Amino acid sequence: MAIQQRDSRGGTNRDARTNRRIKAREVRAIGPEGEQLGVLPIEQALARAQELGMDLVEVSPMAKPPVCKIMDYGKFKYLEKKKQNEAKKKQVVVQLKEVKLRPRTEEHDYATKIKKVREFLGESNKARITVTFRGREMSHRELGQKVLQRIIEDLREVAVIEAAPRMEGRQMFMILAPNPRMLQAQRDRAKAAAQAAPAAAPQPGAPAAPPAAPAPAPAPEQTPEAGPR
């Protein structure tokens, strides 16, 4: 449950009014399990909360009368903070990485640049592919178009076009984004690996395997008995 307390300027503060800070004379009270307690005088609502060892929290100050819920406010704030931190950890910060090429790019250099773009996309980032023209190369823009089109073909399984090729000054560029199917496949593989890991690990408390039996000692060599002379 999100709780926000409006201030006098129409903004919001993070902390709601609680207990004796609630100014209303009567409130619409909600119990700790979400049960409706009806409209109560503030003193009666405070007494209910005190009996349960909890707080009375104003969750909807703009309502008439204000809505207040009986809860453990300290625990509520702790859980809200924990959820916010977990949500931040799950957020993926998408960056725009740039790879630069020339209209005439050597094959080994092209392969290196394509590998780098694949890495960017695999990390959920976007890639700006830029072809820079110099001097008379500006009269052969079709070479840049061919380079970008080749990249589109080579990366069609892992990328989608977010911004189609276009010119800006002496540069022709496009922006590629990760293919959603590729990202989903990565998440599925990671999930499967995470589920398989506990199964492969030894279970706590499981009896250790008995030690291997020692190999039998070799039989002593029999020496022939000497016969009578």
Swiss-Prot record:
It comes from the Bacteria. NCBIfam families: infC (TIGR00168). IF-3 binds to the 30S ribosomal subunit and shifts the equilibrium between 70S ribosomes and their 50S and 30S subunits in favor of the free subunits, thus enhancing the availability of 30S subunits on which protein synthesis initiation begins. GO terms for cellular component: cytosol; membrane. Belongs to the IF-3 family. It holds the Pfam family IF3_C. The gene is infC. Residues 204-221 have a biased composition (Pro residues). It is found in: Cytoplasm. Residues 192-203 have a biased composition (Low complexity). It comes from Anaeromyxobacter sp. (strain Fw109-5). PANTHER family: TRANSLATION INITIATION FACTOR IF-3, TRANSLATION INITIATION FACTOR IF-3, MITOCHONDRIAL. This is Translation initiation factor IF-3. One of its GO terms (biological process) is ribosome disassembly. One of its GO terms (molecular function) is ribosome binding. Residues 1-21, 184-229 are annotated as: Disordered. Keywords: Cytoplasm, Initiation factor, Protein biosynthesis. Monomer. InterPro entries: T_IF-3_C_sf, T_IF-3_N_sf, Translation_initiation_fac_3, Translation_initiation_fac_3_C, Translation_initiation_fac_3_N.
